[in-house]
Amino acid sequence: MKRYRLHIWPVWLLLGMMFLAACQSDALSGENSGGAQQTTVRSDSSYINLRIVNSNATMTRATEAATAAENAVYDGILCIFEGADESSATLKTATVIDQLINNPGNSASVEITQRLATGTHAYGTNLYVLALLNTTSTGFKVSGNDLLFDDSSQKNKTISQIQNLVIHSVGSTDKHIGLFMSNAPQSGYIMPEISSDCLYDTEALAATGNRLTINVERAAARVKVTNAANQIRNIRLNPRNGDSETRHPYVHKITWSLNHYNTQSYAIRTGFTAAENWATSVNYLISFTAKDFSLYPQKSLSQDVVYIGENTTGTETEVIVEVQLKDNSNMLMHECFVFHPYQDVYSENTYHDLFTSPEQYIAYLRDELPPENKGWFGLGGTDNAEIFKYATVKIDANGNVVFSLTNSDFTTVQQESLNNLANFLSNHTAGFRDGKMYYTYKIKHSDTQNGVVRNNAYNLTLVDNDVRQSMSAIGRPKP
């Protein structure tokens, strides 16, 4: 019986190469590039040697590589296609890789011998290999020698048909392990071909002979947010509370979510297979239409990593950071307000006064409202105490500030002026519900292009002295 040896290498180990050698010795060569070959395959053998290599090496454009646990392989399916060339080859058999179950490949190298399904023969045609790794919850499973997706047989399907299947989930995110992986498309092809040079009569010969390599990649990008922020320096807390020193709010904790991202993950990356546009160029060619999906939150407040399905290249994927403020050791859990009559409160690099209760804010306006603000509304000669005698301010269900000014002693004309002033104050006040502020950051996979790339890892560090990723400036009142 002839046997061949198969190695699956994660694509993050080979981003500098991004090519596939269908059959090779210890060093990778680029001589075989998939697609149609002239070799006639005699495949009476039914064993493979599968090697999975995990790497912690930093990837291209990734600020932090995924961990070994995130790259671990917990189960796998090996799919064999048969045909004259890759585009016309159809799926013949699928085999569960038994020894991967409950035996995750967390080490640098894992060698597994696996028997293929019987009847894997090709005389005058070619065989091609597709690996599906960490398939739990994706929709894939094996019944006999048949690959099922949503309980529907994929037998005799082409690689393009398999490629466009939208998987249910990229895998486990509660423990950050077991992310779905499959073939990483190379320049001009997706699946490596099994040539006769990779087939051996005995298992011993296969173990020391040529080997077949498949590059694989995760179906998700990894995003991590780290909080290194302390004070928010351009906010002064309750400047009229009698304190002689200027106080600034502190960052108590952050939570974060993703917005504007693609929720679909395909079995294999779709769109193009040119390696030069994937591994080395800053001008990726795939783009998706940005949609405003529901926020994709952290699994829990104790975790700091989320995963984005498929590519969002060219779209504005955002990290929305929610910051809970505190005053020294006291949490700011009530409605807070900032008055900005002359400028956009979010773009000025100057102090802004934040009032931590409606009462504090109304007291400030009663004592400090500039005369010109009153004059705009015909109230220049009216005492501030009368203007704000029955004032109320609140944040409505939509996060908007609503001011109300009334005085039963005022004439109808004066009351109309009060209403106009109240509308002005509503439109020039930022209201922060429960002492929370929001910061939005775009994710970029190059200096000029928004979006994320499948299989990459992104790390956003929030600090209080970095202009580009700063929490020293005031945040938005709502996401």
Q: PLM ranges: what are they?
A:
Residues 29-60, 217-231:
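A short, Gly/Thr-enriched small/hydrophobic beta-strand-prone motif that recurs across taxa
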Residues 2-12:
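Bacterial N-terminal signal peptides that target proteins for export
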Residues 19-22:
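C-terminal motif of bacterial Sec signal peptides marking the signal peptidase cleavage site
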Residues 59-144, 215, 222-457, 463-464, ...:
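Tryptophan-paired
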Residues 24-27:
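Bacterial signal peptide processing site
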